[in-house]
Amino acid sequence: MHTAIRRAVMALVVLAVASAASAQPSSPFTAEDMLKVASVSVLDVTEDGSRVAASVRLPFDNATVDNRRYGDPTYLSPSNVTLQIIDARTGAIDTPFKGLVSVRTAAWSRDGKRLAILIAQDAAVPSGFPSAKLFVWETGRKALTEVPAGADTAVALNSSLAWTPDGAAILVALRDRTQDAAARAKFRELTEGPIVVHKSTDPFLEWDLLGRDNRSRSIAALDPRTGAARPILPQARISSYEVSRDGAFLRVMEDATEKTDYETIGGTDNVLKFVDAATGQARTVMAAKDLKGLTLRWSDDGRWFAYAKKGEVFVQGIDGSAPRSLTPKPAKADAKGAEPDAATPGARTGDEKKPAEESFSVRSFSRDGSRLLVTSRKGWYVVKVADATRDLIVPLQEDEEKNPRLTAVGWSPDGAAIYATWGARDKWERGVVRIDVASKAMTPLVRDARLYGGVRLSRDGGTFIFTASDGDRPADLYTADARFSSAKKLTDLNPWIAGKSLPRSELVAYRDADGKRLYGVLRYPVNYEKGRTYPIIFELYETFFDNGFNARAAFLTNHGYAVFHPSVNLVVGQPGEAWVKGVTSAANRLIEMGVADPDKLGVQGTSYGGYATVLLITQTDRFKAAVNVSGKVDMVSFYTDSPRLGVRNTHAPEKSQDRIGGTLWDYPERYLDHSAILRADRIKTPLLTISGDQDPNVPASQSREIYYALRRLGKEVEWVRYVNGAHRPPDSVAESIDFEQRILAWYEAHLKKPEKKTDTSALGARR
């Protein structure tokens, strides 16, 4: 009954907001409006959930970047935000800084009375290098105080912040000021020369080493009143650090990498160390060779950690004791056919007919550290750390598509329940659930069509902080109690948008050419009329399911276009087939629905989506206009390019996003098959290709290749270069507006021009 009431209340709130918005006179959503849409990020929440530190960001304030300095450790890209301190009880908002600041991080003291704030200032005088400034905001006095800086060292721009339990000090990372000069000199050497030598005998790629040197930091405890620093750990390449709950020690991940790792993007071999906070004495707990490839989950007191290795869960203490398996692999029968010892914890799965071997992942410890949440394809388990007994609390079906989308948020402080976000697989029904560990009952706290994000539970377990939207408008920040019996809106970030015409969205199901069920997100043209067909633009990437405000879709739908984000089923080895199998099937479905005009189909994508777009139009001529933004077209030339990203462009096809499945020399035919440039002669769709000359990810040479190829072949193509731009090509407010308007103009010219009369009787079947 209570859940039904809560659903009804939330639905009424959504309806009231929608009705109020529809009652206002509306105007078109423009390219200029795209730069005005504010978004919120939560920096930290007090332990009792009463206050939230959040940053509010507008694209308008961050439109210009010096992209030529990508990879320069002494350059900071703009991240200009308004810092807000929000009282979650009253909704009152304080802004400690007048105007915009570049907030690096922020952390509340244990009592919630003070907030440490680290901000960055670029090209600080007199050094000419960016500098960090540390401030403390006192909630009682509503006063902002700058923490005095040291003479020879400064708080590192990549520092974490952590208060000691008594609030007497803030643990920070410090950086020697002389390191900045050396880093900038190395950057200039790599970019300006005049002579640059690269050697395969060097252990590191040059750009990889430059980035790692930025981790050289020391750790100290800073007195927030005087700025006096008490050293804890001398300078080292520190990847990350955390202070224990009682403040007695730090756990430190120290970079011990000996050479560039081609197996992982930004691969780092870390050593796990424990450092006494009082004496600075360090002790190695896990060597780099043992830690490699592991993700550690920590107990609340910081004295135990767990990890999964080859699907088996281990727990280990910081006292140097050996790791202990909590999910031992079933023992194999001996030569005489003896069965494994049934008394062995975890040796049996409960299925006596088939003791299937499960592969587990670790999620989190209970607050007291006595239990672990682990997951497998069979479900969610609670495992007792003491004796490794495990209890299945959320069973899952073998067919993943029949299970809800579940993501753990955290344990209740008393360990009685686990909270998770929940989403249906076949419709927009989403929310938050409470899973009772003892009874295994899953209780919906809130469940409706709204889109929930960034859900976090305060440490005391009494307050949820989250973002929510109706799926068509930008999200705002909300708070609710642990039962979701009351939800309160904390921000109104975009009140002006109530006067704008926005599209409505719909989840559309379809089957690809192989019969696999897929989903995509349709946004209808503003002022859509049922029974009338519209030009439609397909925006490609990988998979889509949830809606949510999309500024570009809002802009295009205001000009009479439907916009569809289709999903595809990507297969390692031959991913290129997925788009023609999936996107054309999605087009067929939208034509069947009476939404899409079959003669006015457009397609576009950015980065991987741009790559997909050009590859798609080499396989079908159904699309009458295409736009490639920062997408590759030549897998061979792309393979070892983009040096500032280290091994990213070799790793992507070998092991990750591009899904080729091996090196260029393992599968040369796959690289050729997925290079649109080699099939440019098959392209009949007019192509607009857009790039930024300073793109460190997908070089502008990729757009250059396809432009000159299509021009040579007599095809219709246009190449737009933003000389100062990068992977996001526009690099100013004016360029951002130009970018969106150029894309619109391309579609206006090719999807809305009068069609020539054709003999429809001669039309053949379409792929």
Explain the meaning of each model-derived region.
Residues Y524, G531-E542:
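Short beta-strand element of the alpha/beta-hydrolase
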Residues R57-Q84, L174-A220, D255-K273, L326-G350, ...:
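Predominantly five- to eight-bladed beta-propeller fold
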Residues P59, A88, K98, F549-H559, ...:
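Active-site-proximal cap/loop segments of hydrolase catalytic domains
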Residues A23-S39, Y75-P78, I86-R104, G128, ...:
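Multi-bladed beta-propeller domains
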Residues S102, S127-F135, R141-T164, A173-L210, ...:
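Asp-box/WD-like beta-propeller blade repeats and closely related beta-sheet repeat scaffolds
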Residues S55-T64, A173, R217-S218, M253, ...:
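Non-catalytic accessory segments flanking enzyme active sites
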Residues L43-R51, A106-L115, S160-I170, Y241-L250, ...:
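Blade-terminus and WD-like Trp-Asp/Gly-His loop motifs, strongest in beta-propeller folds
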Residues A54-P59, A116-G128, L171-R177, D208-D213, ...:
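Beta-strand C-termini and the immediately following turn/loop, strongest in propeller blades
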